[in-house]
From Swiss-Prot:
Name of encoding gene: Tnnt1
Self-association and partners: Interacts with TPM3.
Biased composition (Acidic residues): 1-30
Name of this chain's protein: Troponin T, slow skeletal muscle
Biological source species: Rattus norvegicus
Composition bias, Pro residues: 42-54
Family: Belongs to the troponin T family.
This protein's GO CC annotations: troponin complex
GO molecular function, one term: tropomyosin binding
Keywords (A to Z) from UniProt: Muscle protein, Phosphoprotein
């Protein structure tokens, strides 16, 4: 049975149903009498169903219609499945391409990071080399300056030592307090060069100077106490000598007076 015949058959069935619907309200009288005799039903009365008329001389193959509908549904389902798998395949390809791009970008970033690290390492090495070169030049310059200063100080020390020798020759072996102070300062005074020192070395040097100052203060205190003791002893001896000289002067006058008598 072709599609045209199936369509004609469906149109005939529709016409028969319309005819049945038109013929159904032609029997109102018995229904109206029943409605007057008894109360109205709770639900409407369904008209009797009339089977569709099958045209004579033509046999309808329902199995063929069902088979065609199944084939059509199967074809649509197969089309949907094919579209779904095509879409899924496309999405998988896009996902694989996205993963490849991510891995490629990650590798590029790692390469760029490695390149930057190497550049930074080279820059740090150049800076360290330049710093070392400058430190060597500064150390060499400081050494030259120290040598010049030492030479000047040695010359000054020689002249100062000659001056002290001359002063000693003039005054003999006795030295004044000023001369002794100058001599001791010239022996103890040393040049302090801290330009080349780092933070730790400066801290150690400061600790050393602090201990040295503490030692000097201690020695100064001891010397001051010793000086006080010596002054006290000198005063005591001076008083004794003065007292003894008074008695000696009185005894001398008596003897002289005795002679005169």
């Amino acid at each position: 049975m072709s599609d045209t015949e199936e369509q004609e058959y469906e149109e005939e069935q529709a016409e028969d149903e319309e005819a049945v619907e038109e013929e159904a309200p032609e029997e109102p009288e018995p229904v109206a009498e029943r409605e007057e005799e008894r109360p109205k039903p709770s639900r409407p009365v369904v008209p009797p169903l009339i089977p569709p008329k099958i045209p004579e001389g033509e046999r309808v193959d329902f199995d063929d219609i069902h088979r065609k509908r199944m084939e059509k549904d199967l074809l649509e389902l197969q089309t949907l499945i094919d579209v779904h798998f095509e879409q899924r395949k496309k999405e998988e390809e896009e996902l694989i391409a996205l993963k490849d791009r991510i891995e490629r970008r990650r590798a590029e970033r790692a390469e760029q990071q490695r390149f930057r690290t190497e550049k930074e390492r080279e820059r740090q090495a150049k800076l360290a080399e330049e710093k070392m070169r400058k430190e060597e030049e500064e150390a060499k310059k400081r050494a030259e300056d120290d040598a010049k200063k030492k030479k000047v100080l040695s010359n000054m020390g020689a002249h100062f030592g000659g001056y002290l020798v001359k002063a000693e020759q003039k005054r003999g072996k006795r030295q004044t307090g000023r001369e002794m102070k100058l001599r001791i300062l010239s022996e103890r005074k040393k040049p302090l060069n801290i330009d080349y020192m780092g933070e730790d070395q400066l801290r150690e040097k400061a600790q050393e100077l602090s201990e040295w100052i503490h030692q000097l203060e201690s020695e100064k205190f001891d010397l001051m106490e010793k000086l006080k003791q010596q002054k006290y002893e000198i005063n005591v001896l001076y008083n004794r000598i003065s007292h003894a000289q008074k008695f000696r002067k009185g005894a001398g006058k008596g003897r002289v007076g005795g002679r005169w008598k």
